[in-house]
Amino acid sequence: MVESERSRRTAREDIADSRYNGAGGTIDILEVSKLGCVRGDRRLFSGLDLSVSPGTYIQLTGPNGSGKTSLLRILCGLLAPAEGEIKWNGANIRSLGEEYVADVTYLGHRHGVKEELSALENLRITNALNGVEISKERALAVLKEMGLAGRESLPARLLSEGQRRRVGLARLLVCNTKLWLLDEVLTSLDKGAVALVRSLIENHLTGGGIAIVATHQEFELSTGHTKRLELTT
C-alpha cells in the first residue's frame, strides 16, 4: 500500500491505515508531532505530523532547499527542531539520549568516507566509532558483498565516487539499528548498486525496521508498507 501527501510551506503525513501487520507488530514506534524547522530567517516546514510503525518505508521527496536533509538531521537528533516533538517507543528522544542514538543509523548525502584511509579501514573505524566492532574477516566479507572485492586496501581517494558511496553504504550490512535515515544515498550508484540497496532496505523492513529515504529518484520496494512524504517550498 502506498500513501502520499504534499502541501505548501507545511508537511503532514496521512496516518490513516498506517499500521503494518508484519513481523514488528502494529504499534507506531516513531511519532512526530507538529514538527517545524527554521534555518536562518527562513521557515522550511511546519506542522509535520508523522506516525510510523515497524516495517514502514517512507520515501521523502521535495526540491532542493525544501528541508529534506534538515528533517533527517532532526529525526536523528543532530539538529533541534524549531517546535514540535519526536517520540520513540512513546518517549521523547531528548530524554532517551544515547538509548535512541543506538537505535538509529544516519547516512548523509555525503558518503562520509575518509579519502586517506582504505575501504577496509573506513568500514572498521566508522563502525567502531558507532559502537560496533567488526573483525577484519567480517569487514572483508561485507566489502565483497558491496562489490568492492580487490579494492579493500586501496586508499579511498583512488576509488570512484560510486565505489566510495558503496563503502559508506557497507555500514548497513553490519548495523543492528531499527531506524534508518538515508539522505540521497542512491547518488552516483549504478543499477547493480541500487538493486543492492533496495535488497538491504527490504530485508530491514521484513525484520521490523523502519527506513526513511530522501531521494530525487523513483525508488520502489516490493515489501513493507510504503508512504510518500513530499516537502515543498
Predicted regions and their residues:
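Conserved ABC transporter NBD signature motif
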Residues: 81-95, 99-100
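Conserved ABC ATPase "signature" region
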Residues: 124, 136-151
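Helix-to-loop junction immediately C-terminal to a conserved catalytic motif
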Residues: 76
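Conserved ABC ATPase signature
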Residues: 116, 155-162
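Hydrophobic anchor residue at the start of the ABC signature
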Residues: 169, 208
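Q-loop/switch helix immediately C-terminal to the Walker
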Residues: 110, 115-130
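Catalytic Walker B motif of ABC-type/P-loop ATPase nucleotide-binding domains
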Residues: 180-184
